[in-house]
């Protein structure tokens, strides 16, 4: 029992240590723009996004910088913060990503927790997938920060980058549900107005670093209010169903997302796991102790009659002799039965002879 309580105390001591860790997954840089994910997806607030980019010696990208990154191949289906907006930057249409739209897909709400995009002005102008090995602008702190690059290399550093106390010690769970990583995109919460831009279906012959808004009014993406009678068209998106309806022409639309679920604190999950493990160990120890107590020991009495091996040999000989005696007894019983039958027949014959003589 003492061991059980000792292990439980040791597990409780490990809980805060396991929580004082931050994993930052980063992608390749496209014209200086890259995507950052913290501890799974969608766990970065607006204020933390700015602090995180600053720690990487970067800033939140502008719309023009995002569009330039898309022009050279940057694509992801993840919601993230940029300067003044929350965007999804898909290149190819996908029914479960930005409602089948392409370009810089903008959500007007920026109050929830998402991932973030950062822009490093000193990065190469094209694609750059070299590993990031440092968080240069992080300051001293107790947090273990691990940078996970696209190729799987990991670099760990002790420190802190968050300056907002609400980001360091959140008092309430995030508004949006945090889901595990996948290539598909979750739906945005209901009531958001969404704007988007279009990429051309074929690449133009002119310089691709030109502004993302065309000068010609025919090609300029427009934003129109498609509400009719006080009702706006609704786009229903879901990761699981993959169906979407509504406008895809750049008009304002709203999306309805899945039901929000409260987050379970990590320390509670770890504590429950430790308690379950301790309970299993306690049951195993109790069963093992009971089994040992219930075992029967075989008592061997020698009485000075030689070694145990000699007694085993004599016991085997005795068993053989007893089996032979049983065979003799069976043979003897069968012969006695035959003699009894013969005596009875002779007696009947003599009686018949006497009766004949008497007659």
Swiss-Prot record:
Start-end of Low complexity biased regions: 179-193, 233-251
Region listing for Stem, in residue ranges: 225-266
Residues in compartment: Cytoplasmic: 288-359
Single GO MF descriptor: transmembrane signaling receptor activity
Location of the protein in the cell: Cell membrane; Cell projection, Microvillus; Secreted
Chain ranges on the Extracellular side, renumbered to this chain: 21-266
PROSITE patterns to which the protein is assigned, alphabetical: LINK_1, LINK_2
Domain of life the protein comes from: Eukaryota
Glycan attachment residues as annotated in the record: 25, 57, 100, 110, 120, 180
Note on domains (UniProt): The lectin-like LINK domain is responsible for hyaluronan binding.
Record protein name field: CD44 antigen
Gene behind this protein: CD44
